[in-house]
């Protein structure tokens, strides 16, 4: 969506169309937080790791624990990019799963928590896009 809003801004498009109703809920985690969680888990002592991955608990979910509607995400991206047009939702297209939220309680109880809030992560991603990817847009 960052790229789409950026293109719409620079081409002075009046609207950005997003599939679905915008009501579907999603959780987003910055890649740096995912890397941090992986290192945290890797550095656990063996006993602590085994105590938290007993049989039938072999997977450790990594997430931030909060969710946002696609509509609110789109508004946040629109503001981050500085796009002034409208956001339209094409309800003739599918929403996908109504909700996707990880249960990261086990990892949080081990002592790991995410550090980068969504708004900050979007700004970081857009700054990176401007610096390293904008030249790839036709």
Spans of model-derived segments:
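C-terminal substrate-binding subdomain of Rossmann-fold SDR/epimerase-dehydratase oxidoreductases
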Residues: 1, 7-138
